[in-house]
Each structure stands twice: as C-alpha cells, then as structure tokens.
Amino acid sequence: MKVLVIGGTGWVGHNIVLELAKRGHDPEIFTRRSEGHYHSAVACFPHITGNKLDEEKLTGIVIKGQYDAIIDSVPHPEPIRILSRLKDHYGRYLHCGSTGVYTPLQSRPADEKHPFATRV
C-alpha cells in the first residue's frame, strides 16, 4: 500500500513510517523541514518538503501521488478541509494528532474542558 505520512519526521509520524515499512507498505513522508526531530530514523524513505497548509502544494502532491492512504500526524484542521475536496484521489485518510481537536489552543496546557475546534 502506498501511504503518505504527513509529519513523518516527528515523534508520532516517524513511528508510523517505520511500522508501515515493517509491514511491507511503501510510506512517503511529507514534512515542513528536511531535518525533522527524528529525520535520521526515516532518512531512507522518500521525502517531500512543504507545509500542509499550502493548499496548492498539498493538492498537487495528493493528485500526483494517488495514495492508497494518507496518515496525518500533525494537529491542524485546515488540511482536513483541503483533503475532503480531493477524496477521489486517495483511498483513506486518518488524522492521528490528538491535540488537533482542540486547535487553536486558547490556553496551555489544554484540559478536558477546552472547547473543540470547528468541525468539518
């Protein structure tokens, strides 16, 4: 399975990339920086550098990639709106950044009473 991992050089994302590869899938990494926190652990996988909030860039990547799945490990709701318009160009979408339901944060740290982000 060809999988785009958004935030694939961060803590959650790089573990997803490694597990996908271990299970025989073909992960590609979409990241803001070429040298992320855990970049060396996933340096052997294809990388695309860019910001997932850049609608034109994200759209181009998704249309060109024709991914079986997109796994998003970065907590921000805007790409969900972008990707929902592109749903014919990929198989499944999984958002797995738990703080994303609370963005933008009104206070730090956020607790269980913090309001949720706008639903899409």
Model-derived features: positions:
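Conserved Rossmann-fold NAD(P)-dependent oxidoreductase catalytic core, especially the SDR/UDP-sugar
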Residues: I82-V120
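Short beta->alpha connector loops
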Residues: T9-W11, K52-L53, V74-P79
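Conserved Rossmann-fold cofactor-binding substructure of NAD(P)-dependent oxidoreductases
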Residues: T49-D68, E78
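Residues at the starts of beta-strands that form the adenosine-phosphate
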Residues: K2, D26-E28, G91-R92
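Short loop/helix-cap segments at secondary-structure boundaries that form the rim of catalytic
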Residues: E35-C44, L86
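N-terminal Rossmann-fold cofactor-binding loop
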Residues: F30-Y38, N51-K52
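N-terminal Rossmann NAD(P)H-binding glycine-rich loop of SDR-like oxidoreductase domains
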Residues: V3-H25
